[in-house]
Curated annotation (Swiss-Prot):
Name the UniProt record assigns to this protein: Probable Xaa-Pro aminopeptidase AN0832
Reaction(s) catalysed (UniProt annotation): Release of any N-terminal amino acid, including proline, that is linked to proline, even from a dipeptide or tripeptide
UniProt cross-references to Gene3D superfamilies, sorted A to Z: Creatinase/methionine aminopeptidase superfamily
Function: Catalyzes the removal of a penultimate prolyl residue from the N-termini of peptides.
Annotated GO biological process: proteolysis
Binding site for Mn(2+) 1: 271, 398, 437
Organism expressing this protein natively: Emericella nidulans (strain FGSC A4 / ATCC 38163 / CBS 112.46 / NRRL 194 / M139)
Source organism phylogeny: Eukaryota, Fungi, Dikarya, Ascomycota, Pezizomycotina
GO MF annotation: an example: metalloaminopeptidase activity
């Protein structure tokens, strides 16, 4: 859309009022917003135009004067580094000019909630060329339109403000820069502390809610106030529900708990899953065997990560390992590995993709997903067009094997049922499921595992009270 009439810019600013407060400049290096703005313009393939993005507004709950928890829009953050409400930005591509607009000063807001960000504070904190109050936004946009409207579009994010900057055009977020990697690394460090704390104290716990509570407490006490996603602490059969978030059932009589939880640091996510025996050792041979299969799936996939690899190939490898392991246990039967894979039978037990990008979102954006989900109701069809891994990507490797009662019942009427021994599979329902997930940075020579949360033998040593840490 080309904006030719300034009157169409529906922005209603308050009167400008600039109150200057002096604060100490942050010792941290600034978020590389200008670099990201240039990167997005490059991916758009244009040398002209204006990128205009709106930050998250302050919003109250319905029928209430209480505000909803604030979470900055990730596209806005990527081009600004601003984690404050009610801000805006413009990036003049031709003139390489990034401008951040902060809220007008409100004395009432300052008295009740504290003062909002000033332009001087913003200048000290953020990497941009200009900092202005919201009151100047409409006139600035109209001036830009008057100067360039004949041949320069305004790029915005949502369909109501076309043309839009879509996930495809912001594929620049696929490859992380040095700053972003540091943030993801820090998020993983705190997540690892929280996961370790759970292992050291789970013998005292009697309900899933206690696991969630201690994980949150550990993260907040180490400066990570926000989680990357809702904590999943599913015990027993709940571990077979991929995004189980009720976290309110007793642990007594359960074999395992699947803890999928990751801290957020400066808006960047971590995504970590550990499956923990509820005791000092494996509660059953069934639980031990399923953990061993998933452990092998993850280890074999992780060691192959490198630039140029098609992630879909790792996804397929994980399925092959799962099929062979379940065949040995007698859960899968009556066919070759290839026949079982083609039928989709392994997707009854491994129904999700092997991984995804991690960044400003826990499932970060990319031009094209690096893998595809399994299918529960149709034959598997390979997808060969999935993209290759690149240096600087941060991805998860998160295989799992689950015994979901509903999924098993539904599959009885499918053609793939001939490959499943349902009597044997139902013996594993008390196990629930096992998932193990790490965050991997793709490097020039292979990978770096950013996730330090204990698993496998180290996990068992902590549960048995033998760990030195």
């Amino acid at each position: 859309m080309r904006v030719s009439d300034p009157a169409k810019l529906d922005i209603l600013p308050d009167d400008a009022c600039e109150i200057r407060l002096t604060i100490a400049a942050s010792e941290c290096d600034k978020y590389p917003a200008k670099q990201h703005a240039r990167k997005v313009a490059s991916k758009l393939g244009v040398r002209d135009g204006l990128i205009y993005l709106v930050g998250k507004a302050t919003i109250n709950w319905g029928d209430s004067d209480q505000p909803r928890p604030f979470r900055q829009r990730r596209y806005f953050y990527y081009l600004s580094g601003v984690d404050e409400a009610d801000c805006y930005l413009t990036y003049d591509i031709r003139n390489d000019l990034l401008t951040i607009y902060v809220p007008n000063f409100s004395l009432q807001h300052a008295i009740w909630m504290g003062p909002t960000l000033t332009v001087e504070e913003a200048r000290q904190r953020y990497d941009a060329d200009r900092f202005r109050y919201y009151a100047a936004l409409r006139s600035d946009l109209n001036s830009w339109v008057d100067q360039y409207n004949k041949d320069s579009p305004i790029y915005v994010l949502h369909s109501s403000q076309k043309p839009e900057i879509s996930a495809k055009e912001l594929r620049s977020r696929e490859v992380k820069d040095e700053y972003e990697i540091r943030m993801i690394r820090k998020a993983n460090e705190i997540s690892a502390l929280a996961h370790r704390n759970i292992l050291q104290n789970i013998h005292r716990m009697s309900n899933e809610s206690e696991i969630e509570g201690l994980f949150l407490d550990t993260c907040v006490s180490h400066g990570a106030k926000n989680q990357s996603y809702e904590i999943i602490a599913g015990s027993g059969p709940n571990a077979a529900v991929l995004h189980y978030v009720k976290n309110d059932e007793p642990l007594n009589g359960r074999q395992l708990v699947c803890l999928d939880a990751g801290a957020e640091w400066n808006c960047y996510a971590s995504d970590v899953t550990r499956t923990i025996p509820l005791g000092k050792d494996w509660p059953s041979s069934h639980a031990k065997d399923i953990y061993a299969i998933v452990e092998e799936m993850q280890e074999e996939c992780i060691r192959r990560v490198k630039p140029g690899l098609r992630f879909r190939d790792l996804h397929e490898l994980a399925h092959i390992i799962a099929i062979k392991g379940l065949q040995e246990l007698g859960v899968l039967k009556a066919g070759t590995v290839e026949e079982i894979r083609r039928s989709g039978a392994s997707s009854i037990f491994f129904p999700h993709g092997l991984g995804h990008h991690v960044g400003l979102e826990v499932h970060d954006v990319s031009e094209q997903p690096i893998t595809a989900n399994g299918h529960l109701s149709r034959e598997f069809v390979p997808q060969m067009s999935t993209p290759l891994l690149q240096e600087g990507m941060v991805i998860t490797i998160e295989p799992g094997v689950y015994f979901n009662k509903l999924a098993l019942e539904n599959s009885r009427s499918l053609p793939l049922a001939k490959y499943i021994d349902f009597d044997k599979a139902e013996q594993y329902i008390p196990v629930g499921g096992v998932r193990i997930e790490d965050d991997l940075l793709v490097t020039s020579t292979g990978y770096e595992n950013l996730t330090m949360a204990p698993k496998g033998k180290e996990m068992l040593e902590i549960l048995r009270g033998r760990s030195k840490q």
